[in-house]
Amino acid sequence: MSARAHPVDDDGEISPVERSSPRQANTPYVHKVEVPPKQNLFNEFMYTFKETFFHDDPLRHFKDQSKSKKLMLGIQSVFPVIEWGRKYNLKLFRGDLIAGLTIASLCIPQDIGYAKLASLDPKYGLYSSFVPPLVYACMGSSKDIAIGPVAVVSLLLGTLLRAEIDPNTNPNEYLRLAFTSTFFAGVTQAALGFFRLGFLIDFLSHAAVVGFMGGAAITIALQQLKGFLGINKFTKKTDIIAVLSSVISSAHHGWNWQTILISASFLIFLLISKFIGKRNKKLFWIPAIAPLVSVIISTFFVYITRADKKGVQIVKHLDKGLNPSSLRLIYFSGDYLLKGFRIGVVSGMVALTEAVAIGRTFAAMKDYQIDGNKEMVALGAMNVIGSMTSCYVSTGSFSRSAVNFMAGCQTAVSNIIMSIVVLLTLLFLTPLFKYTPNAILAAIIINAVIPLVDVNATILIFKIDKLDFVACMGAFFGVIFVSVEIGLLIAVGISFAKILLQVTRPRTAILGKIPGTSVYRNINQYPEATRIPGVLTIRVDSAIYFSNSNYVRERIQRWLTDEEEMVEAARLPRIQFLIIEMSPVTDIDTSGIHALEDLYKSLQKRDIQLVLANPGPPVINKLHVSHFADLIGHDKIFLTVAEAVDSCSPKLSDEV
């Protein structure tokens, strides 16, 4: 921003002079705030559009390239595997092989359990860890994320689906609606990425996500009490009161002690394995393979003891073979189309939030960048293709991704290795899971969701921002006391409410001068800062829009009234100048201009002059276009608060 100089006379009025005029002795040198060069409407629109949707300049690699090179770069942007695949070597493969085998041992038992969480046959969990990871490996940009079904999305999807169709009485329609929801989840994710609308998921605050995930984890754990205790008749509701009532009411006749012995023993084993892995990072493989070891041992135990004859519930038959096509099962018309769309949008957004958060976390650890919009397209494509190959909503799994990271994965090939292992399982090993007890699946899921209850993050949220803590607790209690969808609705609602509150009620502060400097700061933050006699300086910490313009005007007037009462009580010089520090005011609209005009008229009646300090380019431009700068006088707009104070109070050095 350029600036011009003009001196101030002894009466505090600013008299313009030419830049070439010599400055008089002891005359403060002040700077005029310049209006930025005017742009035509099209250029201004294109600049705003680019900064909003293309701030990362995704087309920069295409500049000054031949048509053939641009075509290749375009293909690589959609399929990053083409770029990194050229540099792939045996050394990278070793790391990916170990990581892929490790996460495969973790995903197989988890997939069976998560499918049951969504009220689907266990084979659909395995299907969902075969096709989607292959698609993501070709299109995704994260090296560390491990793809497959996850607990929270499985619970959410199952809850929403059961609200429409009973899976016990109408399993075929239920399955069709699941595939339809998965299709629209993928379409939603891909559309957000393609149209670069990924910022929409940022409206769900971190605090709300922490609360929602924690509540969902407890809900999932409570749902596993059916398999953990061997209860046959169990509530279909997910709230904590209904679940605990169902558990207690079946205590005398519904619990199976053999089931409890199996589930409790292996849960302790899994927790000890996790503890060992946390204490010694080199032993990360122990908690990774513990679930598969538990499945093998418990299955063998049930088989040789025939515990299933004594009330221990088992998985029973699992079909062999690859994913069958499910394209014809998707609803593209009829009553269930809109229901599938609604469920797909909700589950797709939650899955997207989790995957992007996981991808960014591990990318930061390895110091590389992922493109959020490309990730959304990749996740969307894999779910669209997955819906056509008998898969349900898949996303990035935090537990598997953490194991993948610690196992030393180098590229997305670890997902391909995992898919191959799942493929071999589907072709040859599924009959071996016939005697796998449901109790061990319950123990595995409980062990997997425990880390989702992040107590340390909740405590930190409480310390940092109490309103964030309210959002966190609102989502948490909404999930565990009502339902998953209500908890999600509360999380989104409170997140939006916080945004609206911050937009409509921006902070304002009175500024004072730091002794020995020309710096003006918040007097509450710096108690040593001194007020200037006859001058009130207020900073507005937000853009001034229609949503907050009246509040800003009223808040400034209230500051002024309080200051005048204090000055009158202390018999100090009355307020003659009101300086508004506008550095944080990034923009202003028509309502904001009208609010300043109303403030100016009100100050005139009280014989107080309005002065502005350091308005930014968009603001100063609009002040000139609206002629507000002409109204208050160009000599009342300054580059800094210090210059404004010096100009308004030329005898300041004698008084302070």
From Swiss-Prot:
Localization of this protein: Membrane
Topological domain spans for side Cytoplasmic: 1-94, 141-144, 278-283, 364-375, 434-441, 495-656
Protein topology in the membrane: Multi-pass membrane protein
GO cellular component entries: membrane
Domain STAS: 525-648
Alphabetical list of Pfam families matching this protein: STAS, Sulfate_transp
Entry's Gene Ontology molecular function annotations: secondary active sulfate transmembrane transporter activity; symporter activity
Main location: membrane
Protein's UniProt keywords contain Transferase: no
Record's note on what induces expression: In roots and leaves by sulfate starvation.
Tissues showing expression: Expressed in the phloem of cotyledons, hypocotyls and roots.
Ranges per topology, Extracellular: 116-119, 166-176, 219-256, 305-342, 397-412, 463-473
Region (Disordered): 1-30
Keywords: Membrane, Sulfate transport, Symport, Transmembrane, Transmembrane helix, Transport
Entry's transmembrane regions: 95-115, 120-140, 145-165, 177-197, 198-218, 257-277, 284-304, 343-363, 376-396, 413-433, 442-462, 474-494
NCBIfam families assigned to the protein according to its UniProt record, in alphabetical order: sulP (TIGR00815)
Similarity comment text for this entry: Belongs to the SLC26A/SulP transporter (TC 2.A.53) family.
Chain's role: High-affinity H(+)/sulfate cotransporter that mediates the loading of sulfate into the sieve tube. Plays a central role in the regulation of sulfate assimilation.
Note: Loss-of-function mutation of the gene result in an attenuation of the source-to-sink transport of sulfate.
PANTHER family to which the protein is assigned, alphabetical: SULFATE TRANSPORTER
Name listed for the protein in its UniProt record: Sulfate transporter 1.3
